[in-house]
Amino acid sequence: MINTELFKEVSPLSAKDCFILIERQKSNFNFPIHIHPEYELNYIENAKGAQRIVGDSIEEIEEEELVLVTNPQLEHAWRDYNNKPQNIHEITIQFHSDLLSDQILNRNQMISIRELFHRARK
């Protein structure tokens, strides 16, 4: 059973950074439920059967997983579930919400990115 105690993650992303990239190799995939103000893009491979918890959605992930979180209050976590311990590869990119300004996101070529960010808030 997942620990439902929420914690606020402290990112190594500084005010002067555009983004940070964190790459990990691990044999299990447990990351407790948390929030943080940074936007976050997660790519995970080799964790088929693990569970992704984002907001009120709990789903088993596939062999490859790509998740974008753009809501600072959106609780999210991952946990071992039906996956086997193996060489799980995780790449996380965290960036500030103002990295892409409204001025840029309102350009015609950025409409789909703006919509993606909006959907990722839920």
Sequence positions of predicted segments:
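Generic protein-terminus/edge-of-domain signal
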Residues: 1-68, 73
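A hydrophobic/aromatic-rich effector-binding and dimerization subdomain
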Residues: 2-13, 71-122
